[in-house]
Amino acid sequence: MASMSLFELTRGFADIPSALANISILDLVLDSRQVTEGSGFIAVQGTQTDGRRFIADALDRGASLVLAESPDGKISDSRVIGMPGLKKHLGELAKRFYGDPSRQLALLAVTGTNGKTSISDYIGQLLRLLGESAGTIGTLGARTRSGESVASQNTTPDIISLNRQLADWVDQGIRFAAIEASSHALDQSRLDGLTLHTGIFSNLTRDHLDYHENMVAYQQAKLHLFQDFCPDRVLFNADDENTFPAREFASQSALGISLRDASADVFAQVTSEAASGLSFLLHSPYGSTSITTKVHGRFNAFNVTAAIMAVCGLGFAFSDVAAAASYLQAVDGRMQAVGGGEDVRVVVDYAHTPDALASALFTLETSCPGDLWVVFGCGGDRDSGKRTEMGRIASGLASKLVITNDNPRTEDASVIASQIASGCMPNCDGADVLIELDRAAAIVYAIKSARPGDTVLIAGKGHETYQIIGRAQHAFSDVEHARQALAARGVADV
């Protein structure tokens, strides 16, 4: 286990009493519950709780010392050290303690409203298909060379956890890592001090306005990935002008990816959206070829292309990367088919924003011979302004709507559902709308009621294995409930 003295860790940041200078630190943690013997506990004010409240707990658990922005005067212990400006130095402290791991591997970061998980996962898959070791960090947790996952509470972990994970991968010989960079993480400086090889900006559409207040602030948070880190290479969406400013901050090169403009730096021309998967012609500075994949959704042409360009930017041959793309697997909870689709086609997708819901429904509508059903809701204690918009979109593209719970948290679930339904009414065009707040019952109703040839989209939760009601998490999986409903219908999962 690596260790560092307090003097080495804080040199240049704080004046440490000589009697404490040689205290050995075995790890850094922000959560007192993770403290083990010899840990250094970092006590700072967070967005949801104040770490300084847990100084005593950290010491009881065996912390060798506590660094606190402004220590609680009630605790008189020489191991509690005040460090003004501690929070803004977290990135540098973590980088120093863990040996600056982002410089020892090629780190790629993906930001954007939609597509972060898919792009980062595709990058990891492509690298593994090419025989390389790669890790990914994001909504699906931390995944290593063989694809196994370790759950993470946030899309982008705190900067200490990030550095610890990257350092562990460096020790394992992993040479590449792709991470999701959420707007919250960028705004809260959770990536500070990292060195980026590639930055990718997928798109910007409405989301998180409960946090950012307006789209300008939301865009600025995303742009921190480029302004603050100046990646060697930048990939942006040539079809979304909100992403254009990112190209100005590339240290070496920037490429715009388009699904519409043949004159763009990179052009992905969709040629087929079949039950077997998505195909497109790819034209890029690295070469041109036809790409055939097993993934679904026109929007995935952008995601796959971004991953291909990112991996080519690491120095891999275009022909090899393009060939590997045909073996890409669908990302958990992203246009994930449940069952064989011979009777009723059932798809689970994470779509929880207006744009993502529209993209998923449009994709399924084009290949649905029968009625298109959608089971969805909107999260509580989150941007309430998108609820009516999602109702409008759903009623405009689907024939049958079942509005239900989607992590209502502390809000009244019936109020959320009514707000969604109010958006459906002016645009209903004959769509049937049912409110069933029990999400399990809603899934059963849609799958049981659908006729052969119909498609049922279960949107909003994707890979999640829980439902948040009040402040408690309850076990819940859209995929498992869909499988059970199909089994009750007499359809075996494949």
Residue ranges and their predicted role:
Residues 1-18, 37-40, 50-53, 286, ...:
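ATP-dependent carboxylate-amine ligase
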